[in-house]
Amino acid sequence: MFSHTHTGVTDFERAFAFYSVVLKELGLVLRFREDDEVANIHWAGWQTPGVGRPLFLIGKPFDKAAHLAGNGQMVAFLATSRAQVRRVYETALTKGGTCEGAPGLRPHYHANYYGAYFRDTEGNKVCVACHD
């Protein structure tokens, strides 16, 4: 469905440290990291091992303007189990994320929807969900 998604950050090092640990809990691996101080380009991408796409990217905005977290914008990662949802959520909170909705069933979406919501260290809203 998606080629990639890009989430803007201001403090790249803090965001990179946060996502490196959180995405590891989802089984994603770092595909690349680019730091070009001269051009002020800092970005990184993760993927499922052995699969070229989709990519989850973080980076400073290319227009060099400050990053602003969007209201109503969210990235949702697919977990393989409810236990994985809980692990990712707990990892996110221990690494500086903030709660936007503890892990649990959300039957108003569908009977088996189990998700958790948090904000990353930059204020971006993130969801982790499984559908079993």
Write out the residue ranges for each language-model feature.
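N-terminal beta-strand motif that seeds the catalytic metal site of vicinal oxygen chelate
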Residues: M1-F16, V75, H131-D132
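Core segments of cupin and vicinal oxygen chelate
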Residues: G8-R53
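Conserved beta-strand in the GNAT
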Residues: P54-K60, Y117, V126-C130
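Vicinal oxygen chelate
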Residues: T10-R14, V75-A116, T121
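Active-site beta-strand termini and strand-to-loop segments that position acidic
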Residues: G45-V51, F118-T121, H131
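Long, continuous compositionally biased terminal/linker segments
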Residues: V38-Q84
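Short, solvent-exposed loop/turn elements at beta->coil junctions and helix N-caps
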Residues: D35-D36, D63, P103-H108
